[in-house]
């Protein structure tokens, strides 16, 4: 059954079960980290957008007193590069590792589940934390071999899907008998799903499903 709840809804559900109060920045639907513009060379627009987001996050986090959870690793990677060091910025995997694993009682899945470590997760040095989160949620985590960058390349996977297909040419045979896959970037997950035969979603869904009731 395809998941009906959005990543935001699931994230709030998990955070509240861990005892957190969730605060959203004002005008959140108008905010953007600027990555889509930066990737196309529109650096002034990218910096203007990230500046707006930075201001809103500083206000919402009480000048960095509270940690900030972002929903994808590429956005978080840019934000860490260009925003104030006052902000404690996390993508899902590191936030789960640092702030949720010790607050939630998890029941490991007995199924073999696939995991994809995104390029920006690697750049941020999150491989070990990714593996720790995976092992906390399933007895049989699978990190496919010879699958590095997924080739979605920001939004190029929408317009040049052949790049994505070539980058993931070794994926399907390794995961098509598995029940699901998990990562921390929605565009990567779209390409992974399209080229693997299984559905990839955010690791936050996996944690939600692993919480003991």
Predicted regions and their residues:
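Iron-sulfur cluster-binding electron-transfer modules in prokaryotic oxidoreductases
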Residues: 1-213
